[in-house]
A protein has these predicted regions:
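Conserved SGNH/GDSL esterase-like catalytic core that processes O-acyl groups on lipids
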Residues: 130, 143, 150-159, 178-263, ...
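N-terminal secretory targeting modules
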Residues: 6-8, 16-181, 348, 353-356
Length: 356
């Protein structure tokens, strides 16, 4: 009798699974129609790139190429579907590199809101094996969802599937009340190297910690504060600008570009706070350029304490512990280092923006 009941339950469960897996049971929503965050410009060539064609002349060749990567772009929505599927296609067949996993470079990352802890919790990652990929997972109807796009690859297609008849809706405004993004301009570390998956980049972790949207303008090896890049950064109406470029700059470049860049950004957005970040290293004490940058910030604040009251500096001691365990190569943070940076920057966001 027990065997008969168990067999019946198994058959019913199997039939339900088969029905859900049937292509006819799904409705697909293209990324262009889903509630999206993290894209600083509405007129990009596709929904998955970071800088529009009209600003190509402001970018170096390297920055322009890297702006095709979807780092920081994410989707936030709720659905009453009990199961979801995600399909995406990346443009670069090189899915992983020496210091980036396939999941981080080319994968998507799914988070769900946990009402009990009031935090976003990891739900489903991905292991891309080719340029076309798909994942599926059960879902609690009504639970808020957030899906991060790949850090270091170009997305050419993105779709979310829900069971037919299910609704997909944007999330309500954040509890923090912050609607304008934190705009992070920087280097490969800002870009996301070397988080094992997109949701573990420090920019994503800091944003979740402070409950704010963010835009990622990190460009590997290319965060050099060129004067023309002020146009790109300042065009985005931000709640806070984060400048994390020292890793890619020599002392000479810091001397030439740091102060003019900060002054021009402040001139264009005089009421928006600016957070300048020191570079840091596992193996070295403070660098000459880090000390230079801190002195420039202090000089500006002394020059006019009222005008520059919202200019801030985050030292390396608030970013990584420098215990030799937080990087993959002595420079790029691993997940441990990314968490340390996410906490440090997230705490600063809350302090600067007056959040609890």
């Amino acid at each position: 009798m027990r065997k008969t009941i168990a067999l019946g339950v198994a058959l019913c469960f199997g039939a339900a699974c088969a029905e859900v897996k049937s292509q006819d049971a799904w409705e697909w929503h293209d990324g262009s129609a889903l509630p999206q965050e993290g894209r600083g410009f509405s007129d990009t060539a596709t929904p998955y790139v970071r800088i529009p064609d009209r600003l190509r002349g402001n970018c170096s060749g390297a920055v322009w190429g890297l702006s095709r990567n979807s780092s920081g772009i994410c989707y936030r929505f709720s659905t009453d579907s009990r199961q979801m599927r995600v399909k995406w296609t990346v443009g670069d067949p090189v899915l992983s590199t020496h210091n980036m996993t396939g999941a981080g470079r080319s994968g998507v990352d799914v988070y769900g809101w946990d009402e009990g802890t009031k935090t976003w919790r990891f739900v489903k990652g991905s292991r891309p094996k080719k340029t076309d990929n798909e994942i599926s997972f059960p879902w609690t109807p009504g639970r808020p969802c957030m899906i991060y796009l790949p850090l270091y690859n170009e997305v050419v297609r993105f779709e979310v599937g829900v069971l037919k008849g299910s609704k997909v809706a944007p999330l309500p405004p954040r509890a923090s009340g912050v609607s304008k993004p934190v705009v992070c301009y920087g280097t490969s570390i800002t870009h996301g190297a070397s988080a094992s998956r997109p949701g573990l980049s420090w920019t994503a972790q800091a944003a979740r910690r402070a409950d704010v949207p963010f835009v990622n303008l990190g460009f590997a090896g290319s965060g050099k504060m060129e004067p023309s890049m002020v146009d790109v950064v300042a065009e985005i109406d931000a709640s806070l600008y984060v400048l994390d470029c020292l890793w890619n700059m020599s002392p000479k470049l810091v001397e030439e570009r740091f102060e003019p860049f900060v002054r021009e950004l402040h001139r264009r957005r005089p009421t928006t706070p600016i957070l300048c970040a020191e570079d840091c290293s596992t193996f070295r004490d403070r660098t000459e350029k880090g000390i230079m940058a801190e002195k420039i910030v202090a000089k500006l604040k002394a020059e006019d304490p009222v005008a520059w009251k919202d200019l801030h500096f985050i030292p390396n001691t608030e970013q990584m512990a420098r215990d030799c365990e937080e990087t993959v190569d002595g420079c790029h943070p691993n997940d441990c280092g990314m968490r340390q940076m996410g906490i440090g920057f997230g705490n600063r966001y809350k302090q600067i923006l007056g959040l609890k």
